[in-house]
């Protein structure tokens, strides 16, 4: 359903001919394929070049004492530099030996992605290669489904640009790294697309997998519930469809149950947030704390942490108009999901750096990029270049920063 600035109260059923469906599918694959390879080539080239020219920060020995992200020797390690940094250490550790009861920090990292990495590792015999392959494949799927969903809601031109917008977003560096972002992106888009096209069993199953991938995954209940209430196909809403929605929290419940059966704390995923310095400050109070941190940072730009506060605030400012556009132009389910997902990091800020990880939270909020694609499609080539070129430059810079073991997000 094409939305031209007016928010409909209900969702219309999807009807298409087979020929039309085939054309749309082929366009989605072609556009996604191009965005995937160009963006990943940019990430790899920038990251490898930076690691080769400038080497690694001394932090590598502190945050990766076991050298799990650099097992190949100098040349090989440089080639995989953009793939395994920072949280990759945790995912690789979990893929190797799970969740020991004595290490509560690991419970902040949900199990589905490391489980897939461990499974792939039995074939490729390299945890880093396994993690990168899982992420790369998931990102490819995510781009195709994002194209399909955006075309459905906003039209083909918006879909074509939306996949480029998300692939070139600076936070997209993690979509091909040993991180769970690509898996969660694929599952969350697939979940919403399934519900949008009336496949409620698929929506519930993918939502449950999303809830086993990230702490925010359980919030996929929100868009599904709103979509169920907003159906307009002339039939009474089916209780069976709502029952599939109730499957979503099962992913989180399974994780908690597995921890308890292993002798650990069933509520460790919730308690782990305290270990990583997240605290409840009040609904969206993180916006104020992040603004204050950025203001202080402007007066102390010589400090890396201060500069990071300013950069993170810039991401927050850039996100606001996209959120407003989603609320105005997309069906209510998308806006509800975006607000619920942003409420987590912005209501539970990190003490030392309130907006920490915000670019990663934003990167997986696909409705934002759907609307960015629509806005760019409606404008001139100059508008598109003015947005996508700096975004690509930012992606290259972030790739260089992360690959040399300097912190981003």
Residue ranges and their predicted role:
Residues 129-130, 146-168, 186, 332, ...:
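Transmembrane-helix signature of polytopic, membrane-embedded enzymes
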Residues 145, 165-168, 183-202, 221, ...:
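Specific aromatic-rich, kink-prone transmembrane helix
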Residues 107-111, 115, 123-141, 304-313:
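Loop-to-helix entry region of an early transmembrane alpha helix in multi-pass inner-membrane enzymes
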Residues 245-249, 378-407:
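Signature aromatic-anchored transmembrane alpha helix within multi-pass, membrane-resident enzymes
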Residues 119, 133-153, 318-325:
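Transmembrane-helix motifs of polytopic, lipid-linked glycan transferases
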Residues 82-125, 284-290:
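Short hydrophobic/aromatic helix or loop-helix immediately within or flanking a transmembrane segment
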Residues 42-60, 83, 210, 221-322, ...:
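Membrane-lumen/periplasm interface segments of specific transmembrane helices
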Residues 177-183, 358:
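Short acidic/glycine- and proline-prone juxtamembrane loop motifs at membrane-interface regions
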